[in-house]
């Protein structure tokens, strides 16, 4: 009986300790602050609307942007901001203001712009220090097809980043399950706390229409450009690669059975790879001595290098002939 009583006493004591720990967590200031800081969706919309704006070039609406500090620095997409002409921003809160380009990073389709200085701090969205994980809900403020301040919900569709080829180069981004019409490019993707976890850059489309997947630029790239405030030029081969299993069935029939590698596509005439002897539809058998079969792995390897470095490629024609080795001097992606 005494043993049973002792065990019950220990169990009651452990349960008491457990309750005290749980209560202390709920009463801890950091927990309370975090709980209070989580805005309603209505408040989140208002916060994002205050810090977002439309991009105008020569008076025409070309995309979206958003403020990322109180001094008037803001982010938008390079594929819109690069267009020549008078750059302005417009919103119900800001009115219509002139803006200037400070720096860009084509490897992330990203442009840092600056609004006119003023005494009153600008409303802005803080940029998260980490990516949102797979399945997490995210919220986009955009300007779809000339409509204003539209709030779009999505979910992060993969872990980590991937690379998509558009606007003439590979862009690093994160997939989001969401329908994002044209005009949303440059808009902020936010988490539930109102922190920027990405910037809308592109959509997965076919001639039949949107495929339900969007690409957002990772927050790390936005923070980096804001900190540097100067152009970032990643290394480029001035060509693209595609995976063998993604090719047309007739192409796959022409290549030797068991071939491993990547297919050369979008080879730029007079580009650095073309000058080194690379040809359209070549198969890249090895990269710096490694067999690489996935595009993401290839681009990550490339992005670890800097302009001026050499990349060693082992190539062959699609029918297995003309095997050769070339060295390509990497160019800056400007």
Language-model region placement:
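Conserved active-site neighborhood of the chymotrypsin/trypsin-like protease fold
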Residues: 52, 58-62, 67-150, 173, ...
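C-terminal cap/linker of serine protease catalytic domains
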Residues: 34-45, 99, 122, 144, ...
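Active-site region of chymotrypsin-like
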Residues: 47-54, 116-124, 150-215, 219, ...
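Protease-domain processing segments flanking chymotrypsin-fold serine proteases, especially trypsin-like
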Residues: 30-58
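Bacterial N-terminal signal peptides
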Residues: 17-26
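A structural signal for short beta-strand/turn segments enriched in small hydrophobics and glycine
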Residues: 72, 135-141, 194, 273, ...
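PDZ/PDZ-like groove recognition
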Residues: 179, 230-286, 290-297, 301, ...
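Gly/Ser-enriched beta-turn/beta-hairpin loop segments
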Residues: 43-47, 104-108, 159-174, 228-233, ...
